[in-house]
Swiss-Prot record:
Source organism (scientific name): Saccharomyces cerevisiae (strain ATCC 204508 / S288c) (Baker's yeast)
InterPro entries: AGC-kinase_C, CheY-like_superfamily, Kinase-like_dom_sf, Prot_kinase_dom, Ser/Thr_kinase_AS, Ser_Thr_kinase_AGC, Sig_transdc_resp-reg_receiver
Taxonomic lineage of the native organism: Eukaryota, Fungi, Dikarya, Ascomycota, Saccharomycotina
Feature: compositional bias, Low complexity: 343-358, 611-632, 669-692, 970-980, 1014-1031, 1378-1391, 1463-1481
Alphabetic keyword roster: ATP-binding, Cytoplasm, Kinase, Meiosis, Nucleotide-binding, Nucleus, Phosphoprotein, Serine/threonine-protein kinase, Transferase
Encoding gene (name): RIM15
Residues that, per the record, bind ATP: 800-808, 823
Residue segments, region Disordered: 334-358, 530-563, 583-694, 970-1032, 1378-1403, 1448-1507, 1519-1572
Designated name of the protein: Serine/threonine-protein kinase RIM15
Amino acid sequence: MFNRSNTAGGSQAMKEGLGINKLSPISSNSNPSSLTSSNYEKYLQLATEKNPCMILELELDGKVRYGSPQWNTITGVADDSGSSPTYIADLILGSDQDKGVFQKATDMLLMNDDTSCTITFKIKAADYEGSAGCDDESTITTLEARGILIRDGHTQLPSHTMWIVKPRTNDWSDFYANEDAQDDMVIQLSDNCDDIDIQLPEEFAKTLGFGAKIFVQYLKRIRLEMIIDEFNLPLPKMELCRVCENFVPVWWLETHSQSCVCEHRTESLIQLLHDNLLEQQAILANFTKDSEYKGSQIQVRSNNFLNQVLDSLRELCQDAIDINPSEMVPDLYHSLSTFPQDNGNNNNNNNNNNNNNNALLDQFPIQKDTVSLNSYFQFSPRTNHNIQNVTSWQSRFFLNDDQDPGLALLIHDTLDLARKKVDAVLRLDNAMTYSLKIKNEVNNYVVQLIREQIEINKHAILTHPMNLRSSSIFHSPLPQIHSQQPEAENLIYSSSTPLQVQHDQCASFEAPSKSHLEPIPFPVSSIEETPTANDIRHPSPLPRSCSNTVMKLPTPRRKLDSNGLFSDAYLNADIIPNPSIESTISIDRDNNTNSRGSSMKQYGIGEATDSRTSNSERPSSSSSRLGIRSRSITPRQKIEYSHVDNDDRTNEMLSRDKDSLQPQPSVDTTITSSTQATTTGTKTNSNNSTNSVLPKLMTSISLTPRRGSPSFGNLASHSMQQTNSFKLIHDKSPISSPFTFSKDFLTPEQHPSNIARTDSINNAMLTSPNMPLSPLLLATNQTVKSPTPSIKDYDILKPISKGAYGSVYLARKKLTGDYFAIKVLRKSDMIAKNQVTNVKSERAIMMVQSDKPYVARLFASFQNKDNLFLVMEYLPGGDLATLIKMMGYLPDQWAKQYLTEIVVGVNDMHQNGIIHHDLKPENLLIDNAGHVKLTDFGLSRAGLIRRHKFVPHKSSLSISSTLPIDNPANNFTMNNNNSNHSQLSTPDSFTSDHKQYNRSKKSSLGQQYEHSEYSSTSNSHSMTPTPSTNTVVYPSYYRGKDRSHGSSNIDLPASLRRSESQLSFSLLDISRSSTPPLANPTNSNANNIMRRKSLTENKSFSNDLLSSDAIAATNTNINSNNNISLSPAPSDLALFYPDDSKQNKKFFGTPDYLAPETIEGKGEDNKQCDWWSVGCIFFELLLGYPPFHAETPDAVFKKILSGVIQWPEFKNEEEEREFLTPEAKDLIEKLLVVDPAKRLGAKGIQEIKDHPYFKNVDWDHVYDEEASFVPTIDNPEDTDYFDLRGAELQDFGDDIENDNANILFGKHGINTDVSELSAANLSPPLNHKNILSRKLSMSNTTNRSSNNSNSSVHDFGAHTPVNKLSIASVLESVPQETGYITPNGTGTTTTSAKNSPNLKNLSLAIPPHMRDRRSSKLNDSQTEFGSFNFRNLSALDKANKDAINRLKSEHFSEQPGVHRRTSSASLMGSSSDGSVSTPGSNASNTTSGGKLKIHKPTISGSPSTFGTFPKTFLRSDSFSTRSYSPERSISIDSSTLSRKGSIIGDNQQTTANSSDSPTMTKFKSPLSPANTTTVSSYFSRQRVLSKSFSQRTNSSDLSAEESDRLQAISRVNSLRNRRRSGRKSSSTSEIGYHMDVLVCEPIPIHRYRVTKDLENLGCTVVSVGAGDELVSRATSGVSFDLIMTALKLPKLGAIDIVQLLKQTNGANSTTPIVAITNYFQEAATSRVFDDVLEKPVKLDELKKLVAKYALKKSQEDEEHTILSDSDETH
C-alpha cells in the first residue's frame, strides 16, 4: 500500500497514523455454516472499519478546504482554522509540474465535469518518532486521489473539488528502485498457492499492464508442469478482439485494444473523407458558371478563368482520391542480419554467441520476419507523389471572398477535404508503425521469458532429479533480462511505446546472450522541440522527446484498485493521434535507403535520419530516484484538423523513422478539442538534444467517465452473460473493416470460404496467421485488418417481417453469437423507386444517433452486388402497431409512458436538426425492457415531398446521372468488372480506361421502370406492376388485419376500419414512400436526381452531435450531396388539392399521420409536422384507430385538412373517462391543430412538457422508469411479437468481390495456373484449431456446419496431439477454418477441402507478377449508395473493455481467500433446451396465470386490473440478445473450453412460436406494486468486491491488520451467499429482510433509533456518525444493500459525498442511497438520492422503504442463485 522502501518503523508509524490497529486474526478454518448472526455483524464491522481512505476538499485554486483526520495525521497539517491556508501544491514533492498536478486536474474537471479524475502524487509524511530529520525515501508516501467537481447547489457554479485519497495500492511502479539499479529492475510476483516467484522485466510489465499478471500465471504453469520441451508448451488462453476480430492472448488484449480501436477509427475517418472527396469530384465534374455552391452564386465573368480553377481543383481532388494508406513491406536486407543465427546486433559492436541448438527461428526460417522488427510500412510511389501534391498545393488564383464567395468556398472546401485525408492517412501510418513496434517488442520478451523458464526447468531436473518440486527449484528466479551495457544512458519507458533510447544519451538494449532474441534497439531521432500552449492542450498518448533523466511516460498501469473497473490508461486511450500533414517522416534502415525513405525525402515530406545510440555516462541526481513519472491521459476527444501553415506543423504522434518512435511529452494536459499548433520541429544532433528534454514527473493524472457513461455504466447486470453457440475459429469475412488497405498475409487455405477476398501476399518471406496460437505471437498482425462486414458473417435464422423493398431477418453473428436484426434492401428496387437518398439518410442518421437511448442502434452496414444490409439492434418486443392490434387500445398508464418517451426522442432529434417526417406506430419499436425506440429515418431531414413526387427540370438532372461514361474527365471510379488485379485506389496500377464511372446501371434501371405503374391489392403484399393505375399502397409488416378488429369494445363505424390494402407497411422498412415513375420519357435519368440531393437544404447537424471528426465526416457526407443546386426547387409540392376533382396525383404509403402542411407542400422543413404525428399516435394508443382514418388516401387528406377529429361515440361522460381523461383529450386537441403556428409545441418543447397531462412526469429520467409492459422473451430467437407478412428466407447473393474470385484462384479458390506448385514439400502446420477440435469432440453434441458452400466437415481430433504446442510451430502459417463451440463445451470444426499441407504456402509460390495487390476499399466501385461500409466502433470498443473487465474479475476470483460463486455464465440460465426459467419454483404458474383477458378489458388505470405478474429477469441491460455485451466470453481457454451457461442448449428444441401473429399471452402488465422493481447491478458490485479483495490479498507487504480485514470481507461474502440461499427457500411471509445497511447520522439518538428499527426489521446495520467514516466504510470493498445518511453532516455535505460515491467506480457506486432529513425539499431537488425520508422516521415508513429495496435485492438474489447453480452444474 505504501512504498516498499519504507522502513519497518516508518511503516508501522504510518499504520498507526492511519488508525490501523492490530486485530485478532480470524481463524481461516472456521466453519461458515456455524456462524451466527452476531458473527456476521462482527465480520461486517471488521470488513469495513479502518479503511485507509481519506476525504480531501480543495478550493478551485488548490487551497485545502477540508481534510480528514487521517490526512492531517499523514501530512502533519494541523486542523486549525486560524492558521494560514494550506495549498496542496506545497505538500507535493517533485517539480513545479508535479506540484501543479491537482490544478491541472481541476482544469480538466472544469472543462468536463462528467468525468472523475484520478491522480497519483508523492508527499513527505509527517515526522514520526525516530525519523525526525530523515530525508530519505522512507518518509515519502505515494498517494492516489480520485475526485470530482462539486457545484454550488443554488448557483450551479463550480464550487470546489472533492477527493477520495488513499495510499496507492501495490503497483508495478511500487517496485521501482532508484536510477542506479534501473538496469537490474525486475518485478516480483508471488502466488499465494505455491509461492512461486516470477520476475518480469520492468518495461515488459509496464507494456502489458494488467496482462503481466496473467502472463506470470502462464509462466508459473510452465514451471509447475516442468515443461522442458518447446513442443509441449500448454495452450494459452485466447480472447477475441471485437474490433479487429482476431484472437489474441488474454495478457495482450488490453494493450492491443488501445491501438486497435485507434487504428480502426482512423480508418473509418479515411473512408468517410474519401467518400466526401468522390462527392466533391462529382460536383466539380458538372460545375458551370450558372451553378450555385451551398447557396452562393458563382460570380466570375470569364468562363476560361472558371475552367482553369475547376481543372486545378479536379486535379487536386483526383490526387487526394488516389492516396492510399501505407502497406507493410519487409526489409529483406536487414531481416537476414537481425536473426539469432547472425550472432549480433546491428546497432552495436557486441556479438552474442549462439549456443542454443533449439533456437526458435533456426527451425522455421520461413517465419523469421514474423518477429523481425525490420518490417515497416511504406507508401506507394504514386501515393507519395500525391501526398506531396496535396500538401504543397497552392491556388494560382487569387480570389477575394467578397468578390466571389461561392467559388472561394468551393476552393476552400475541396482543399480542406484533400488535406484532411492526407492528414488521416499519415496518422494511420503512424499508428500502425507504433503498434507494430510494440507488438514485436512484446513478442521478443515473451520468447525470451518462456525459453528462460524452460532452461530453468531443464537445469532444475539436472540438479534436482529426485525432487523436481522442491522449493529450491521453484524459488529460483528467472535470469534477469537486462542491458549488457551497465553504462547505458537512461531508458525511456512507456506503457504504450517500445524501448527507446536517446541519441548519445540512451543505451541500446540487449537481451541476455543465451536467449538470442534481443529486443531490437529503437534509436530516437533528435528533434529539438519547445512545448507550446497548444502542445499542452493537445496531449498525445505517445511521448515526444527524451529526457535527461529517466522519463516514464505514462506511468505503468497499476494494479486495479478497488474502485476501478478498467485501467485509467485504457479508459482514456480513445484519442486518435493527430499528426500534421508536414510531419517529420524519417526512415532508418541502417543506412539502407529504401524507396519510401528516398521518395519522402524527395518530396520534402520528411528526411531519413540516422540517430544510432552511443554509450555515455549515466547522470545521477537525487530527484531522479523519486516517484512515479507523469501520465496525463485525457478522455475521448474530437479529431480536429490543423489549418496552420505547413511550416508551423510538426508531428504530434510519431517520428516517421520506422525504427524509432519519438517520445512526446504527454504532461501538462488539458482537455480540449481544438487542433494542435506546435512549434517547428528542428532537426538537431545529439549534442543539442538535451535542450528540449523535460523533467521527469512524480505525479500522474487520468480521467474516468462518471457512472452512467458508456465506459462502465450498467456493467453489473452484464456480468453473467455468455454466448450460446459461436464459432471458435471463424469464417473470415472480407479482408478488412471498414475497408481494406493492407495486405492480407494469409495463405489461401486460411480463408477457405472467402478466398476471393484474400489478396496474395507481396512478401515471399512474410506470413502471419490471423489468429495467434501461442504466447509467442502476442499481437495479431496489425496489417491483417478486421474483415469487411459481409452477410456471410451471419447465420440468418428466420424472417421477421417483409416490406416493400426487402425484408428484415433475425440473424446471429457466427463469430460471437450476438443476435441482430438485419434489414435487407434490394438495390434495384431502391434505385427504381428513387429511394437512394432515403437509404443514405437513414444510415447516416442512425450512425450519428447510435448512442441515443431512443434510437434503434445501428451496428454495421454493408452491401453486395444485389442488396444493402443494415445490421441493427434486435428489439424483440415488436412495434406499437402490433401492440395496439393485439390489445385493441392501451391503458392510459401505458400510453403515457410511450408518449413521454416519444416526446423526449422527437425533441432531441429536433435539437439536433433532424425532422423525422414519418412518425407512426409502425416506426416505434419496443425493446426488451419495454421502452420505445425510434427507427426508420428514411424520410428524415430531406423531407417527404421532394423525394415523393419531385419531377426535376431537365437542367437539374442528377450530377451522377449526367456524367458520360466515356468522358475521361469524369473517370474517377473504377468499373466493377476491372477490380480484381489492380489496386483500386492506385492510379499507377491501372490505366484510365479502367476507371470508368459506372452509371449505366442507373440509366438502364431508370428506363426499365419509366413506363411502369404500380398497384397493390389486398391479397398481395408485394408490388405488382400494372398499367392500370399509378397508385401503390404498401401493406404493414405487422398488421395482418384491421387494427380495429382487435379486442376494443368501442363500436367503431365501418368508415373507421381499415381495409387490408390501406394498411401502412412496416417501420422496419427504410421508407414508407417512394417516388412514382416519372411521366416524361425523355428524361430517362431524371429519376436519379435525388441520389445526389442532400438530406436537407442549408441545414446541418448541431455540433453537440459531432463528438469526433468521424461523425463530422459523416455529417459532411450527409450534406455534401447538396453542395450544388442547379435549379430552383419546384414550387408545386402539394400532395392533394381538395378542389381538383380531376387530379391524377396519387399517394402511396401511410397518409394517416401526415400533417396538413405536409399535404399542402409547405411543411418540409417545419418540425411542427412531427408534433402533429405525435398527436395522431397518442390518439391511436388510447382509442385504437387513427383520428383521420378513411378508406382512401384522398378521403384521409380531406379529413386532415379539415382538422375534424373523429372522436368515438360514448354513452356517457363516465364511459368516456374510462378511455380518455380530460387532460389527454385536451392534449390531443392541442396537438392536432391545423395551423402549425398555433399547434402545441410551436413555442418550444416546454409548453408540451408543461401540459397538465404530463404532471408529475420526471422528464430527466423517462427511460429510467419501469416500463408498464415488458415483453416476455422465452428464447433469444423469439420473434412472436412480429408478423412474418409472407417473408421467407432467401439467397442474398455473392459479395461484390466474389464476382472476380476465380480470376486468380479458379473455381475452388486455387490458382489453376500454378497448381503444380502445390506439390512442394512443405511441412504441415500444427493446427491450433484442430487441438481445440479434439478437445471439444470429447463431448457428444450435434455437429453444426457453417454457412459456407465451399466447406466440408472434418474431424481433425485424431491428427493432432492434445494440449501440446511448440514455440516454433506457432510461427508457421495457420489455416483459417470455421468452427463452433456448442453450449456444453463441445464443438466441431469446419474447414475447407483445400486445407492441405501441400497448399500451406501456396500463395508464397505465386510469382510476384501474378499476385494481386491488395485492393483498397477506398476506391471500390462507388455505387449510388457509396461505400456503405460502417461498423459501430464505439460498441466494439465497449465490448473489448467489458471483456477486459471480465478477465480481471475472473483473475481476481481465482485468488485464494476470495469466495465467489458467480462467473461469466449466461443470464439465460442453464436449461439445455434454451428456454428461460422465471426465478422461483413457481415460475411456470406465474407465467401462465398472467394472461390478460384482452377480449374484456376494463381500462380504468388501476394496477390491479391487469394482474400481478412478475417480470422476467431479461432486462435490457442483461438480456442475451444485447449485442456486444461484456459477458460474451469469446475466449479460448486451454483449461476450460466448455461454454458455461450458454444461452441456448445444443438441442435447441424450444424455438420461437412459428405463428405469424404474436401470441396473446405475450402481453402482460406487471402493474402490481409487488412487481414494479428493477434489476439493479448486483453482479457489478460483486465483481468490484471480488476485485478489491484480490488486489489487497496479492500485496506481498500486506499487513496483518489488513489481512484480517480482507478475511472478514471474504467471510461476509460467504455468509451473504448462505443467507441468500436460505432466503430462496424461505417462506414469503418471513419478516426479516436480511439487508446490509450503512447508516450515517451525526445525532446519536437518531442514529440509535434508526439502527434499532432496521435491526428489528432483520437488517444488519453498520452505523457511523461522520461523513469521513461514511466514505471510509462505503469504499472498503464491501457492497451494502442500502445506504442511509443524514443530509446535513459536520464539515462535509451529504450531497457531495453521494455524488462522489456514485460517480466513481466503487463497490457501492450503484447502491441505493436514501436521505434522512428535515429538509425534504432540498434533498428531493438535489436528484442524487434514490429516496428521501423525512424526520422523524416512523417505523411504518422505514419498513416500506426497506421492503421496497429488499424486493429488488430479492429478485437479484434469485437471478444470482440460478446462475450460480448453473455454473456449478457445469
